[in-house]
């Protein structure tokens, strides 16, 4: 993939998460789901189709995410093959309510945000579903 600047292909989603665990820690499945949501949005931007997750090369959980946290998941395009797309994912905690202030409604924006998880994964978008793929990305594969 020479010549094409992939840095412009990224997707960001943000939301407030909750937990059903007694210690208030958010399920790791919720974090992976956030990667999937950001990744699907990225796939729509690139191909006009959500594609299919093939595998994660790596997934790292680096810091806990708690009930009430605001998180930002980012998916970035790293490489494009004929039908495969390699992506990186990051999840940052951008605001926290746990242990902040005297009230249940207390919270604060984190500066800098906390990197809570990261991953690298491969997705597949069959050729017949690549309806919006930019010509430069098609030529590169």
Question: Regions from the language model: what does each represent?
Answer:
Residues 66-67, 76-141:
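HotDog/MaoC-like acyl-thioester-processing domains
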Residues 13-15, 59, 89:
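Preference for bulky hydrophobic residues occupying beta-strand positions
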Residues 1-52, 110-141:
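Hot-dog-fold acyl-thioester-processing enzymes
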């Amino acid at each position: 993939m020479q010549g094409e600047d992939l840095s412009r292909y990224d997707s960001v989603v943000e939301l407030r998460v909750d937990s059903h665990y007694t210690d208030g820690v958010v399920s790791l499945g919720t974090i992976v789901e956030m990667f999937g949501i950001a990744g699907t949005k990225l796939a729509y931007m690139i191909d006009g189709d959500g594609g299919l997750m093939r595998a994660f090369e790596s997934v790292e959980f680096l810091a806990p995410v708690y009930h009430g946290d605001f998180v930002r998941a980012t998916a970035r395009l790293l490489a494009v093959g004929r039908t495969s797309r390699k992506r990186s994912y990051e999840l940052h905690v951008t605001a926290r309510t746990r242990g902040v202030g005297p009230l249940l409604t207390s919270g604060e924006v984190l500066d800098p945000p906390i990197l809570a998880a990261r991953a690298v994964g491969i997705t597949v978008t069959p050729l017949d579903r690549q309806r919006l793929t930019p010509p430069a990305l098609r030529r590169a594969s």
